[in-house]
């Protein structure tokens, strides 16, 4: 498992890969998102979660809910913050104020945060306070998907999102500029554009030129919005 710093970088890289993916598949725009320093994910199959980072304090708090987990049956009597019982107080506070705020749901008429697995960091090290297999069964599998080396993560998203060479190059460039706090110009990532591209050689009825839409307008908007959540602007 990587440390806090690498996990944060991996979440950023994953989100940039996601932004390029929704350029062509805008329906999945909600599968990854950022709100401040809170990274949220949703697999649309019953598992969702949020990782809240406090980089200045070198801590994070992560909470996940799997609808398939037996832990769900403990609610509403059980309180999600109890998953952080052995965490330091500053981590508990981060979990309560941030991560768990994204997991509100209703159980037997009671609306409260519902989580089935949790993890945190102490001194930058990621801590999982239960058996690894139980943690995965309770919704924690995604942490192991993104908690790998940069090269492994890059290969994972290339395959998962079926990114071609141009798309992957755009992901890498945006990520490198984000890390370096450098500007990104539209000509640096020509694949990200909303206008229709005409192909003169293709003709439809009555000899009219057919239009090929390179990127759907909503896909472009979702891509730009996803990047914007990280403060990334294409000039």
Question: Model-flagged regions — what are they?
Answer:
Residues 63-71:
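Short, solvent-exposed aromatic-acidic interface loops
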Residues 58-60:
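Primarily extracytoplasmic ectodomains and periplasmic/lumenal surface modules that are beta-strand-rich
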Residues 42, 62-63:
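Pocket-edge structural micro-motifs
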Residues 1-46, 55-56, 71-235:
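N-terminal domain-onset segments
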